[in-house]
Amino acid sequence: MKIAYFDTEIDPTSHKVLDIGCILEGGRTFHSHSIPGFVDILKGVTFICGHNILLHDLKFIHQSVTAAGIQLSNAIDTLYWSPLLFPNEPYHALLKDDKLQTEDNNNPLNDAMKARDLFHDEVASFLRLKEDFKRIFWLLLHDQKEFAAFFSCIGYNCAKTETEAIIRQNFHPYICQNADLQRIIGAYPIELAYSLALIACNNRNSITPPWVSKNFHAVESILFQLRGKPCLTGCAYCDRSLDAEQGLKDFFNFDAYRTYEGQPLQKKAVEAALRNKSILAVFPTGGGKSITFQVPALMSGQNVKGL
């Protein structure tokens, strides 16, 4: 199954194709502005692959791709897979937000080679995932245009099963048991996949890449629904990770908040913040106001990357 990795340089005003770089899996290269030459090297290719090609390159050269006999549904975009497979900070060395790290900004052949290297790393990373995590990604993403070609190319599929059940089974200690997962799965499968990847990496310094937040706005809301909103009945996750006293212990190693005239004002203020509620609490000078801001902020940073 042949794959062509490519990148283009496009005039931002005229949208004219200024340069094209392409490398086949076997090593044959193409570097020219010639559209007929690009079509020629693509003949016999099954999949095309590049970085940010769905939002950028294919807008300008999609006719060349189809002229070579390649279905546009067979376009693999490494951009969308990167936050799923490299969520840990520091991130993949070839990435800088939605761009490839490159020494030469005007050499599409060099960027095509970088896209090839990144794709190979993504495939290797996917294959190293636990089987249940592979299944979760497939169940959420196999019919999404940004992800379907990747699964087809590597030949991965699995039996359809209850998506909510397998997510709850694997993320039981890390998300609220009363979150409306079924609604999120139906409405925001891509955003949920990005959220789960970030949760699973368990690295407080890892964040959602800016381009993901820009293009998939619901990620922030989903993280909040899964990990930042205490449920009314309580559950294993909320009782541990959204508990005001546990947060005080975790971050400051204090066992209890101060009380004032018998009132636990600090604790009430922190609990109100954790529940996104308003409260008016009047503290004496030096009465520990700062900790009522710090504890919920630090807990938000840890739970939903909200700091």
Question: What label would you give each PLM region?
Answer:
Residues K2-D11:
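Two-metal-ion RNase H-like nuclease active-site motif
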Residues I3, T46-C49, K305:
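Structural motif
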Residues L18-L24:
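Short beta-strand scaffold segments in enzyme catalytic cores
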Residues L24-H92, K99-F126:
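Conserved DEDDh/DEDDy metal-dependent 3′-5′ exonuclease domain
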Residues L94-N178, Q182, G186:
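Acidic, Mg2+-coordinating catalytic module of metal-dependent nucleases/exonucleases
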Residues G186-D243:
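Interdomain "pre-motor" coupling segment immediately N-terminal to P-loop NTPase/helicase cores
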Residues L232-P284:
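Conserved pre-motif I regulatory segment
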Residues V282-G287, I291-L307:
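Conserved SF1/SF2 helicase motif Ia
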